[in-house]
Amino acid sequence: MWSLRGLRLAAGHCFRLCERNVSSPLRLTRNTDLKRINGFCTKPQESPKAPTQSYRHRVPLHKPTDFEKKILLWSGRFKKEEEIPETISFEMLDAAKNKIRVKVSYLMIALTVAGCVYMVIEGKKAAKRHESLTSLNLERKARLREEAAMKAKAD
């Protein structure tokens, strides 16, 4: 019996024999760039085309808004607003925004620590005055009981 591989080899052999006898105009219509690999046809890899001269190493520029100009000043990129060019690169703006983000996060960390220290100091002062949540709740409940008792007497 013929195996599948044997049939494929025989068909390929017949195809090559017939291809030699075919006239040249018909042969030219066939894609000559195809390669035969294990009986399969594949297109050759195309080399990447060189970029055109006008777009090589060109970074798109951005006209900064007033707020973005302030960000550039606060980040220390420029000393005065007059020094800021009319158009800047996105990378410069991103770097300035990242610096501001870091500065704001440091400020928030410092404010959080200062708030914690303030709350600890206030808590210690309240403890010296013997003020606690438990004592405040007991006083409030006692006051509510008195008001309820007075209301019951009045009715």
UniProtKB/Swiss-Prot annotation:
Its main location: mitochondrion. Residues 77-103 are annotated as: Required for proapoptotic activity. The chain crosses the membrane at residues 102-121. Pfam families: DUF1075. InterPro entries: DUF1075 (IPR009432). One of its GO terms (cellular component) is mitochondrial membrane. It is found in: Mitochondrion membrane. GO terms for biological process: cellular response to hypoxia; neuron apoptotic process; positive regulation of apoptotic process; positive regulation of release of cytochrome c from mitochondria. It is a single-pass membrane protein. Keywords: Apoptosis, Membrane, Mitochondrion, Transmembrane, Transmembrane helix. Interacts with HSP90AB1; HSP90AB1 is essential for FAM162A mitochondrial localization and pro-apoptotic activity. Interacts with VDAC2; the interaction is probably involved in inducing mitochondrial permeability transition. Belongs to the UPF0389 family. Proposed to be involved in regulation of apoptosis; the exact mechanism may differ between cell types/tissues. May be involved in hypoxia-induced cell death of transformed cells implicating cytochrome C release and caspase activation (such as CASP9) and inducing mitochondrial permeability transition. May be involved in hypoxia-induced cell death of neuronal cells probably by promoting release of AIFM1 from mitochondria to cytoplasm and its translocation to the nucleus; however, the involvement of caspases has been reported conflictingly. This is Protein FAM162A. It comes from Rattus norvegicus (Rat). The gene is Fam162a.
